[in-house]
């Protein structure tokens, strides 16, 4: 049969989450085929794992919003935020093993709002945050600039490239208050039925200066009854579009969010602008029962095998 071999060395004798696993070493996974006999000579080269460390800050909703929908916002604690780093998706069979180890990268800030995401193999990662309330959104995540005179680096846009054993420090994760939410359904045809094919919705920032703000892009799968839900959205102007999901894009673990790619963002904005329908989301607004009309792409018919007359 087919097997995946991987070696893990931890001086403490146990794998722990976050910063506790900074001294762990791991090999790249190797595919091994066993055909009725012992397999020898499999080499697994250990290399030190990398880490990203930083702090969490927060910004309250604007004073004007506190008088209306954001009045008396619920209190939250930074220690409740779950922080992770998502690597670029790969579809190799051996990467299934690495995905099972992702639980060890998750961490939470300490009482000083500091965190360390450990247990990371070489590659490009984008930090992510699971927020403890619908009133919150990720406003920015930045790294120190290469030179003091330059601006901080947008880690959500560029990702964080890690080498074996590298320790990247200084990530600032800023949490904003006053997030909006959007729920609705996608319908097709004259009878407003749910799409017959698997569909995904994309929320796209409409402001020109937000074209490359990756944290302003959202996507969600549409359920079989046509429903969708998007939350923790920064207030602003948006377009909403839907697309049929191709077979290669149905596995969330084996694909990247479309907004990670500059070309993906450009395509979404082109499609969104063509709708000429803006959605204005105010601070703390909960827009429900939104109906998005979707026109499925017409699949081309097969070419005739008969020669032209």
Map each language-model feature to its residues.
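Long luminal/extracellular ectodomains of secretory-pathway precursor proteins
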Residues: 1-309
């Amino acid at each position: 049969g087919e097997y995946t071999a991987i070696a893990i060395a931890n001086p403490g004798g146990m794998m722990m989450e976050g910063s506790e696993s900074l001294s762990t070493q791991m090999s790249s996974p190797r595919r091994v085929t066993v055909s009725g006999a012992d397999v020898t000579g499999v080499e697994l080269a250990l290399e030190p794992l990398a880490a990203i460390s930083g702090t969490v800050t927060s910004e309250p909703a604007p004073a004007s919003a506190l008088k209306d929908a954001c009045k008396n916002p619920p209190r939250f604690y930074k220690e409740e935020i779950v922080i992770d780093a998502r690597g670029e998706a790969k579809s190799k069979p051996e990467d299934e093993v690495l995905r099972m180890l992702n639980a060890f990268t998750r961490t939470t800030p300490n009482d000083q709002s500091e965190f360390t995401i450990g247990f990371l193999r070489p590659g490009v990662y984008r930090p992510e945050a699971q927020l403890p309330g619908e009133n919150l959104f990720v406003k920015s995540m930045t790294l120190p600039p290469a030179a003091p005179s330059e601006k901080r680096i947008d880690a959500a846009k560029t990702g964080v490239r890690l080498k074996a054993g590298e320790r990247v420090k200084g990530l600032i994760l800023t949490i904003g208050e006053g997030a909006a939410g959007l729920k609705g359904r996608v319908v097709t045809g004259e009878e407003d039925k749910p799409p017959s094919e698997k569909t995904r919705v994309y929320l796209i920032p409409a402001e020109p200066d937000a074209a490359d703000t990756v944290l302003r892009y959202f996507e969600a799968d549409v359920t079989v009854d046509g429903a969708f839900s998007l939350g923790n959205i920064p207030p602003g102007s948006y377009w909403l579009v839907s697309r049929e999901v191709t077979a290669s894009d149905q596995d969330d673990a084996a694909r990247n969010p479309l907004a990670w790619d500059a070309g993906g963002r450009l395509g979404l904005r082109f499609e969104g602008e063509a709708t000429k329908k803006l959605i204005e989301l105010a601070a703390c607004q909960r827009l429900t029962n939104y109906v998005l009309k979707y026109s499925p792409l017409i699949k081309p018919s097969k070419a005739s095998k008969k020669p032209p007359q």
